[in-house]
């Protein structure tokens, strides 16, 4: 085997591994957002990755041809036609995390243009991604639900304690009148 053939074999193996890794990400994600990033600096891309990571999402940049192969057999296969030019794919298990960060990043960076996305088998245009981004996150929803559950118990405890408190104030007022007389 010549040196060129060895290099090609190694390159082919690396591409196959990249496709398998991407396929695993696409199979387990609930939402994918596709954006074009032509002209972004390395620092801006690092900031995007950091913001996505903080939100529980991730960003993948790969060759479009490899990404299209990796999409096969996944729920988000519909984003394949959106992969044109320098594209980035943001994914998350929380259906709101990746869209929310992508929309905020696009507002601050005009060279980051959202093309569309997919939530499961549902294809999203730019407006669909914006709509998802405007929804509360799973953690926010959980907090609201806990608040709704806890609020009645708190009010019930306040109501149960209120008559005893009123009685104590009446007795105190009566005792104060007796001392003044």
Curated annotation (Swiss-Prot):
Keywords: Ribonucleoprotein, Ribosomal protein, RNA-binding, rRNA-binding. GO terms for molecular function: large ribosomal subunit rRNA binding; structural constituent of ribosome. Pfam families: Ribosomal_L10. GO terms for cellular component: cytosolic large ribosomal subunit. It comes from the Bacteria. InterPro entries: Ribosomal_uL10, Ribosomal_uL10-like_sf, Ribosomal_uL10_bac, Ribosomal_uL10_bac_type. GO terms for biological process: translation. HAMAP family: Ribosomal_uL10. Belongs to the universal ribosomal protein uL10 family. Part of the ribosomal stalk of the 50S ribosomal subunit. The N-terminus interacts with L11 and the large rRNA to form the base of the stalk. The C-terminus forms an elongated spine to which L12 dimers bind in a sequential fashion forming a multimeric L10(L12)X complex. NCBIfam families: PRK00099.1-1 (NF000955). Forms part of the ribosomal stalk, playing a central role in the interaction of the ribosome with GTP-bound translation factors. This is Large ribosomal subunit protein uL10. It comes from Bradyrhizobium diazoefficiens (strain JCM 10833 / BCRC 13528 / IAM 13628 / NBRC 14792 / USDA 110). The gene is rplJ.
């Amino acid at each position: 085997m010549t040196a060129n053939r060895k290099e090609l074999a190694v390159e082919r193996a690396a591409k196959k591994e990249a496709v398998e890794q991407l396929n695993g990400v696409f199979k387990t994600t609930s939402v994918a957002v596709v954006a074009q990033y032509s002209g972004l600096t390395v620092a801006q891309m690092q900031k995007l990755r950091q913001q996505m990571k903080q939100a529980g999402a991730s960003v993948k940049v790969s060759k479009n041809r490899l990404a299209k192969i990796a999409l096969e057999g996944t729920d988000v296969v519909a984003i394949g036609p959106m992969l044109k030019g320098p594209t980035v794919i943001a994914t998350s298990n929380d259906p709101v995390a990746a869209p929310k960060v992508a929309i905020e990043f696009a507002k601050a960076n005009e060279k980051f243009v959202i093309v569309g996305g997919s939530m499961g088998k549902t294809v999203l245009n730019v407006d669909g991604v914006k709509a998802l981004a405007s929804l509360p996150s799973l953690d926010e929803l959980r907090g609201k639900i806990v608040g709704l559950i806890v609020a009645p118990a708190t009010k019930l405890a306040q109501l149960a304690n209120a008559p005893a408190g009123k009685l104590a104030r009446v007795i105190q007022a009566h005792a104060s009148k007796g001392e003044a007389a």
